[in-house]
Design a protein with these regions (language model features):
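Short C-terminal tail/terminal secondary-structure segment
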Residues: 91, 95-96, 148, 229, ...
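Alpha-helical segment proximal to the catalytic Tyr-Lys
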Residues: 127, 172-176, 237
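Substrate-binding pocket helix/loop in short-chain dehydrogenase/reductase
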Residues: 67, 95-99, 103-108, 205, ...
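Active-site helix of classical SDR
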Residues: 122, 159, 167
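Conserved glycine-rich Rossmann-like NAD(P)H-binding loop of the short-chain dehydrogenase/reductase
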Residues: 28-42
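Residue(s) in the substrate-gating loop at a strand-loop-helix junction
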Residues: 143
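A glycine/serine/threonine-rich, flexible loop-to-helix segment
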Residues: 176, 188-212
Length: 253
């Protein structure tokens, strides 16, 4: 197991990719804090049934006290924090529009969760990573949209571009502490959240997305978990400040 004796926090772990990340980390031996605004009991049940260790907690990543409580729970439950997966983000349910017609309230909410949330959760755990003496790994979930440009979703695009910039800045600051900071930028994964985003155009979107990649199929959850495990483990111990594109080569077309 690549992550034995490690402790990982995964935000947005109630469903979809966050749940998949949590289960994959646990399968490699990590103890997992499954954190979400929604209930994570199903995620924890899946992990513990498979023989892993996990606890659930409710967190609002845009609230500093909530993030601090999440970090404290991790320390109380498992004694350390080695890995943070900043996965919580607003995507499903966003109302797309031309940039000049985007709803201002929605814009502000996206920035609060996707940008401020990444900052607050990272800030909450970095002290524990430093005091642990072994460094750590922070993995920020960005998006292909940040570098490719997604029409009718400038709020989401801007937030994920900020995550890439934050990844680079944090990597520079935390390198002396042996805390690595990397980002993963996937293309669209066919989760329930993606289906909610595209709505009635979901089936057409699946076909169009697959056709515009060097590898002509849709991205699957398992395509991402391998990258997450790599970045969380000592296999990437000299890798930091990088954005890993997991997009089937669509960026090259």
């Amino acid at each position: 197991m690549q992550l034995e004796n490690k402790v990982a926090i995964v935000t947005g772990a109630a469903r979809g990719l966050g749940r998949a990340y949590a289960e994959a980390l646990a399968a490699e031996g990590a103890a997992v804090i499954a954190a979400d605004l929604n209930d994570c009991n199903d995620t924890v049940a899946a992990i513990t049934t498979a023989g892993g260790r996990a606890v659930a907690t409710q967190v609002d990543v845009a609230d500093s006290q909530s993030c601090d409580a999440m970090a404290s729970l991790a320390l109380d439950a498992f004694g350390r924090v080695d890995i943070l997966i900043n996965n919580a983000a607003l995507y499903a349910g966003l109302k797309g529009a031309r940039f000049e017609q985007l709803d201002e309230t929605q814009w502000d909410k996206v920035m609060q969760v996707n940008i401020k949330g990444t900052w607050l959760t990272s800030r909450a755990v970095v002290g524990a990573m430093r005091s642990g003496g072994d460094g750590g790994s922070i993995i920020n979930i960005a998006s292909l949209a940040a570098v490719f440009g997604l029409p009718y979703g400038l709020d989401y695009v801007a937030s994920k571009a900020a995550v890439i910039g934050m990844t680079r800045g944090m990597a520079r600051e935390l390198g002396p502490d042996h805390i690595r900071v990397n980002a993963v930028a996937p293309s669209a994964v066919m989760t329930e959240g993606t289906e909610e985003f595209f709505g009635e155009k979901f089936e057409k979107a699946k076909t169009v997305i697959a056709a515009n990649q060097l590898i002509p199929r849709n991205l699957e959850t398992e395509d991402l978990t391998g990258t997450i495990i790599y970045l969380a483990s000592d296999a990437s111990r000299f890798v930091t400040g990088q954005t890993h594109m997991v997009d089937g080569g669509s960026w090259f077309l």
